[in-house]
A protein has these predicted regions:
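Periplasmic alpha-helical coiled-coil/stalk elements that build and connect Gram-negative outer-membrane
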Residues: 2-3, 36, 136-255, 351-354, ...
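Bacterial N-terminal signal peptides
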Residues: 8-15
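Bacterial Sec-pathway N-terminal export signals of envelope proteins
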Residues: 21-82, 87, 112, 227-272, ...
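A glycine-/polar-enriched beta->alpha junction
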Residues: 49-59, 66-81, 95, 106-123, ...
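Short, charged, amphipathic alpha-helical segments
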Residues: 123-126, 189-197, 391-399
Length: 430
């Protein structure tokens, strides 16, 4: 019973240790998670925190990073020594000859790589672990960016539904007034038909938006890795993230911070060190063997020390080709680095231009178009009662106001999604 308790306790301790190891992010990812707390939208901030803990893609990237950190001490370790033990006997025909009638041998051997090889392997392992850390951050920020885009899309859909329902209620009032005027022969019947047609179109759009709403909720829950039916709320108004960064500052940020570019950089560094390691393959590795020998029959004791060395005899087909291979891989990694830098630069520049465009459009909509559209609808409602304008003019003013309201929310969402694009490239929250 005591033994079984000890086994259970040991297993529980191992489980806790494994859970703790799995739950501990790398320092750069931990810094990103601390920044996530400052995201303006609290519900979105909570979703980000939950995603970084539960998303299987992020957890897999974390485990790959942890695995590579355990490779580092292995890379600088000597190969395991070999224990040698033997007993040798020879049945001779001559009874008086006792030589080799009971020879015992005990010793060991140790393989010793050429000086500098273990250091190079250790350095390559460190670079690879650093690369996996950058990849861990890149995966994390990419998943978070995907989550934020879906969340902003959900906000836009929710806001569109809210605007449509408000205008639908207003249109129902206008339809009632058109019915009254038609009943008193002050308006044509086509005004009533047009109102009913627009109400039906409102219903069609609401059905489509509600389906899109549920799809987005499912997508977000899938990213967070939880029950797909959990409801997700969005704020009544989405805060607009201030953006005062310059293009030069963002380009410098790509070189200094981008985890995607850092992965390529580490690949090139690893390939460069691999060239040096492959060049060291021209130098011999050694094996030192020491043995204690005892002949029990005659009581003789002796020692044997053997030094072995590998000879790169076939260097033309092996070492030469290995060096050329590593050089080619290094050049390929440099090209990948440049290609990634160009792609990231394009993404940031494009997002930068769209952000400035959305800022101008948001100001134009808020300061000019929306107030004018509201004023036009209000004045047309008053004029319609007195017969100053027809129903179609008033309906057109309502639809124009609705279009401007939806467009404003759409520009706000585009602004936030392009901020997210830059965040994904730089690996930080702006």
């Amino acid at each position: 019973m005591k033994l079984s308790r000890y086994i259970i306790l040991a297993g529980f301790v191992c489980y806790l240790f494994a859970q703790k190891a799995q739950a501990t992010p790398s320092p750069i990812v931990a810094e990103l998670m601390r920044e996530a707390v400052n995201v303006d939208t609290k519900n979105l901030s909570a979703l980000i925190q939950e995603t970084t803990k539960n998303n299987p893609t992020i957890r897999a990237a974390h485990d790959r990073w942890v695995a590579e950190t355990h490779v580092i001490p292995q890379a600088r370790s000597l190969p395991d020594p070999v224990l040698i033990a033997s007993y040798f006997t020879l049945d001779g025909n001559k009874g008086e000859e006792k030589v080799l009638q009971g020879l015992e041998l005990l010793g060991g051997s140790q393989e010793i790589p050429f000086p500098g090889k273990l250091y190079k392997r250790w350095k390559i392992a460190k670079i690879n672990a650093s690369k996996m850390d950058a990849e861990y951050l890149a995966v994390t920020i990419s998943i978070i960016s995907q989550l934020k885009r879906k969340y902003y899309d959900l906000y836009f859909v929710n806001k569109s539904i809210e605007i449509l329902k408000h205008n639908q209620a207003l249109l129902e009032i206008l339809e009632h007034k058109a019915n009254e005027k038609y009943g008193s022969h002050h308006a044509p019947e086509q005004d009533v038909f047009r109102a009913k047609t627009e109400l039906a179109r409102f219903e069609m759009r609401l059905v489509s938006l509600q389906q899109e709403q549920q799809s987005l909720i499912t997508d977000i829950n899938n990213i967070v890795n939880r029950d797909l039916d959990i409801n997700i709320t969005t704020p009544h108004t989405l805060p607009i993230t201030p953006f005062e960064h310059k293009a030069e500052e963002l380009n410098d940020g790509i070189k200094q911070r981008s985890p995607h570019l850092n992965v390529r950089r580490k690949n090139a560094e690893k390939a460069k060190e691999s060239i040096a390691l492959n060049k060291m393959a021209y130098f011999a590795d050694f094996e030192l063997e020491a043995e204690h020998v005892k002949d029990k029959a005659i009581g003789a004791v002796g020692y044997q020390v053997v030094l072995k060395a590998t000879l790169p005899l076939y260097f033309f087909d092996k070492q030469n080709k290995a060096v050329r291979e590593s050089v080619a891989r290094y050049h390929a990694d440099l090209e990948d680095f440049q290609d990634t830098y160009q792609e990231l630069g394009y993404r940031v520049q494009n997002a930068f231009l769209i952000i400035h465009r959305t800022n101008k459009l948001i100001k134009l909509l808020e300061s000019s178009l929306l107030p004018q559209a509201k004023e036009a609808l209000t004045s047309s409602q008053v004029a319609y009662r007195t017969g100053g304008v027809d129903f179609l003019t008033m309906l057109n003013n309502l639809l124009t106001l609705q279009e401007n309201e939806v467009e404003l929310e759409g520009e706000i969402v585009k602004h936030e999604k392009q901020i997210t694009e830059i965040e994904e490239v730089l690996g930080i929250f702006l």
